[in-house]
Regions:
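Short loop/turn segments at secondary-structure transitions that flank enzyme active sites
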Residues: 26, 52, 70, 83, ...
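Intrinsically disordered, low-complexity regulatory tails
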Residues: 1-14, 227-230, 234-244
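Short beta-strand
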Residues: 65-67, 168-174, 219-223
Length: 244
């Protein structure tokens, strides 16, 4: 909610759930642009977006970025379940510990309780972690580029993919980059393996870098990325994640 020319007001859309401890704990500190955002605000936000968020994260392995003391405190990345965390888990072949997953809006409230500010699910089918259900191109710009450059790059990539018959969607990442997503759909289509998904997206990234080397690069090398956009295809490997 924005009031006049003042700061953006973080206003919960629901009351904090009874199970939420320390609901007034500040996770995002107050700035000149917005008021402080509390644990209760995070719970309310998850409640608000549950219907749209869960189809992209539920029943998949999910890695969490947790900040128990807010943005000014320590952060850590969590993949596996742990005692005291009221979240379902999913078994992954080759891993002794099950991964955290989500099944319901109530699980999102548990994320608020755990101060999980970011969700990074696998790009797999629900309950089928060995089968990709989307291709992800992460457009990662050099620091000197503007967001408009990334938007133009996304349009270029979308044009290339749609010329191949793919349906594409654009997703923000929370930073300066963008994700270009290609859903893998069709009941008659044989789904690709993780290796095939990674190989295909790598070939697209390489094609862009070859056709427009002044704009795109398909390697992680910092030196080669100067003034360019890295077309990151590595999020299509098994166990790789992308922010929800």
């Amino acid at each position: 909610e924005v009031r006049g020319k003042g700061k953006a007001k973080a206003k919960p859309v629901t009351k904090a759930p009874p199970s939420l401890s320390k609901p007034d704990k500040v996770l995002w500190p107050e700035t000149d642009e917005h008021d402080a955002v509390t644990k209760a605000d995070l719970a309310a936000y998850y409640d608000l977006v549950a219907e749209r968020l869960l189809p992209h994260a539920a029943n998949r392995p999910v890695s969490l970025v947790r900040l128990p003391d807010g943005l000014e405190g320590q952060r850590f990345f969590q993949r596996h379940g742990m005692k005291g965390m009221d979240l379902p888990t999913i078994k992954i072949a080759g891993d002794k510990q099950p991964y955290v997953t989500l099944e319901s809006a109530e699980d999102l409230q548990a994320l608020a309780q755990a101060a999980a500010l970011e969700l990074h699910p696998w790009g797999c089918r629900p309950n089928e972690p060995e089968i990709p259900d989307r291709l992800i191109f992460d457009l990662d710009p050099d620091e000197g580029l503007d967001f408009g450059d990334v938007v133009d790059a996304a349009k270029t990539l979308r044009g290339l993919l749609e010329a191949l018959g793919a349906t594409t969607f654009i997703k923000t990442t929370g930073g300066k980059g963008l994700h270009v997503l290609v859903p893998i759909t069709g009941p008659k289509a044989k789904p690709p393996s993780w290796d095939e998904a990674k190989s295909f997206t790598q070939s697209i990234a390489a094609a862009l870098a070859h056709e427009e080397p002044e704009r795109f690069v398909a390697t992680m090398s910092k030196a080669k990325r100067k003034g360019r956009i890295f077309v990151d295809y590595l999020r299509n490997g098994r166990s790789a994640t992308a922010v929800a």
